[in-house]
Amino acid sequence: MVSKMDIRSLQYFNQVAESGNITRAAKQLHVSQPALSRQIQEMEKELGVQLLVRGHHRIQLTQAGQYLYNRGNEIISLMNHTIQNVSEKDEINGVLEIGAGESIALLPVMTVINQIIDQYPETSVNIVSGDEQLIKQKLDNGALDFGIIMGNDNLIDYQSLTIPDDNIWGVLVTKDDPLAKLRVITIKDLINRKILISDQAYHQDKLRQWAGNDLNKLTFSGRFNLINNAKLLVETGNCVALTYKGLVESSKTVFRPLSPILKDHNYLIWNNNHQLSNVGKLFVEKLKNQFQTNITRKF
């Protein structure tokens, strides 16, 4: 079945979802409450699913409604972004949509973003945190202009820039943990410990290359997407976390690097098949200059 649902219908539905109340959403949309209710009912009839559970004071999204809300946001954002890119001439304006993993090596990227939004008041930035899989998915469907990923050298489907500084792998432990007394952590030190690791790293070969056959002796007790949440579990003293240097600060924990040293590169990537906006082109140009300046200063 091909739906006749349009962008306005998605905008109306998403406003209802965010407001949690049809009457409130109607006021914000400047339409009547009965008209908005009919719009939602027509969407449900057309799609053949229930989107909302209507309570006395607040509506709740069904599973189908939550899916439509999430994808609707992406579609609306992509539409606005497309209109902006098509209508611009030589002006530098609009939103830079950037997806990024966690790394302190991103400081030069943030410096360039700050320069652009400071120099061009009509620009802004939307930074989405996520792992490589999410970032590539959003790049491919046009929801992001750029992605910043770590540790993956297979970039054949994307344009890319290598960000100069690397990420240093190590272990986050509590200050009273025996491992905190060590200067570096070897694979032998991690045997018989409960280890937390990022979901992305768990599915890559980098750690296996470092640990060799001893990787099978390690106990991975949990996975995470954001280290700040995993840090709370580390602070209980029951687990340690494999992570990058410098991502978390805590009065209860310390970071110890792995030995032999293990590093990941950082890459800025963008889609081969999508034309960049003016602000996107400026972003790449400024980054190239910034990276070249940093490299020159190191010699």
Roles of regions detected by a PLM:
Residues 156-162, 166-168, 225-275:
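Beta-alpha-beta core module
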Residues 44-61:
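A short LG(V/I)-centered, amphipathic sequence patch enriched
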Residues 131-144, 149-150, 201-254:
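Hydrophobic hinge/microswitch elements
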Residues 2-4, 70, 111-115, 132-169, ...:
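Short beta-strand-centered segments that line the small-molecule binding cleft or hinge
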Residues 14-32:
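Short helix-boundary/capping micro-motifs
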